[in-house]
Amino acid sequence: MKFQSFIKFFAIILLMQGAAFSADDEHDHDHSAHSDEPFYGHVGIRLHLDHVNDAGESDEEVNELYTHSHIELGSRIAEGLNIDTNLKIEGEPGGHNHGGVSRTHDGDDRIFEDHPLIVESLTLTYSHEDFSAYIGKFNPKVGLDYHSFPGLWSYSMIEEYKIAERIGAGLKYGTNLDDFGTHQLNISAFHVDTTFLSDALLDSRGHTSKEDGGLGNTEDFDSYAISLGGKDFYSLNNNIAERVSYRFGYAHQEAGTAESDEERYSASIV
């Protein structure tokens, strides 16, 4: 039954992809770019088929079919007011536990095994001119996101360092400096999601509570992040400048149970 449900959901993703929700390389994944549209979306699909023919343990020599895909949907519900969500199916090869689900090898082929369906973000955003304020569940902006890294397995690098699925609020301010690019400052305060949205469908991962501990799991808005990013530079003499983007970020996560506070920094130019 679970496999059938997964196939149905994946079929919906494919239909939406064919219905032109997908984006080309120039798509702007900042939903504020669509804030005047009544309905908008984006589909990202990764389908992996791995064959392991030589491993340290014989039960790891298997075939694996899995997907790491997402649907971003949004709607303008009033003047300057938008609601956005990101639904993600987080499949991984055996031995990985991204998404809060442990995946192990037992010698059998793994066909769409251990695929939690996650509400990774659900936000309400108010925008006025260059300012935006948002509240809900989101991934605090610190470093580069999925769409900035090339390669088939680039998403796994992001999973290792990103701060994800936090409850809180934030502010954004953007400015356009013409030939000197567009820039955006993003500031947010948050804590780990301990609501019903912390569980998953298809493959449950359980409900997160404060007692589980971990960074930012305080149920207070005492963790925070700040970042500055820019792109869209222009030069008559240098085509490289037009392709350059940057992001600098900092985050502080307050200690949960049996943890210490964490400070993290990010600097990138691509």
What does each model-identified segment do?
Residues 219-270:
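Detector for outer-membrane/organellar transmembrane beta-barrel domains
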Residues 62-195:
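Outer membrane beta-barrel
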Residues 43-51, 85-89, 135-137, 185-191, ...:
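Transmembrane beta-barrel strands of outer-membrane/channel proteins
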Residues 23-41, 73-83, 127-130, 176-186, ...:
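Short loop/turn motifs that connect adjacent beta-strands in outer-membrane beta-barrel proteins
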Residues 8-17:
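Bacterial N-terminal signal peptides
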Residues 58-63, 90-91, 163, 179, ...:
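Solvent-exposed loop/turn segments connecting transmembrane beta-strands
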Residues 52-58, 94-98, 142-147, 194-200, ...:
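Outer-membrane beta-barrel proteins
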Residues 24-70, 221:
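Short glycine/proline- and aromatic-enriched beta-strand/turn motifs that initiate or cap beta-hairpins
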